[in-house]
Design a protein with these regions (language model features):
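C-terminal cap/substrate-recognition subdomain and adjoining C-terminal extension
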Residues: 7-215
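Short glycine/proline- and acidic residue-enriched helix-loop micro-motifs
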Residues: 1-7
Length: 215
């Protein structure tokens, strides 16, 4: 209960949660994207508590949340321990599950499903169609395959964050752009990058699907 109360009051970065709604509308109202069935799914893979995120104002615009969870006492519904913690290894597992189209519940209850062999053309969201936003070293194992797979890795830092984290992200071509200050408001550098990345990816999907229909 206290986690849910905290989640409802969770302070968010500038521009959130309205930016999530606007980005989804940006994709859904583009005629070319609509005719080629291009959609935007938004996932959160976080070392924070899942219940807090689910209770936050972000939740209505999120398609999947992967975070730390508690084990509860059955009679009192009180937390009695940590059920799952999210390390950089877990972040990578969930990322590959999203790529392969394995639903969040299955990834939780049957973790070995992430090892299923999926042909490239059967991947639900290939790395080349991902935009991964990371803010620290634990995101590097996820940023690297996304960027090397043709997707976009965006480095972000909190307004009160340190330069060190951004510097670590930028080493070894782990990110495509950034790091930017976590400002998602229209007109900000971060928002311009996201708008451009969505436009380019959407048009690439549109052209690819149109080509396949013609051939």
């Amino acid at each position: 209960r206290s986690l849910q109360i905290f989640g409802k009051k969770l302070p968010l970065f500038t521009g959130l949660p309205s930016a999530l709604k606007e980005l989804k509308e940006y994709v859904s109202t583009n005629p070319s994207f609509y005719t080629s069935h291009v959609t935007l799914d938004i996932y959160i893979i976080s070392g924070g508590f899942e219940e807090v995120i689910r209770a936050s104002k972000l939740s209505p615009f999120i398609d999947g949340i992967f975070g730390c969870t508690f084990a509860y006492e059955s009679s009192s519904s009180q937390p009695i321990g940590i059920k799952s913690a999210i390390s950089f290894t877990e972040k990578t597992r969930f990322l590959h599950g999203i790529r392969k189209g394995i639903d969040p519940l299955t990834l939780r209850t049957d973790p070995y499903r992430v090892n299923d062999a999926i042909a490239p053309h059967m991947q639900r969201i290939p790395f080349s169609r991902m935009i991964y936003i990371g803010d620290g070293p634990s995101d590097i194992p996820c940023l690297s395959p996304v960027v090397s797979g043709g997707g976009v890795g965006v480095g972000v830092s909190a307004p009160f964050g340190t330069f060190k984290k951004g510097y670590e992200l930028a080493q070894g071509k782990r990110i495509t752009v950034g790091p930017y200050t976590a400002n998602y408001k229209k007109g900000s550098d971060m928002r311009k990058v996201l708008d451009e990345a969505l436009l380019r990816m959407g048009l690439a999907i549109y052209i690819d699907r149109k080509k396949n229909v013609i051939t």
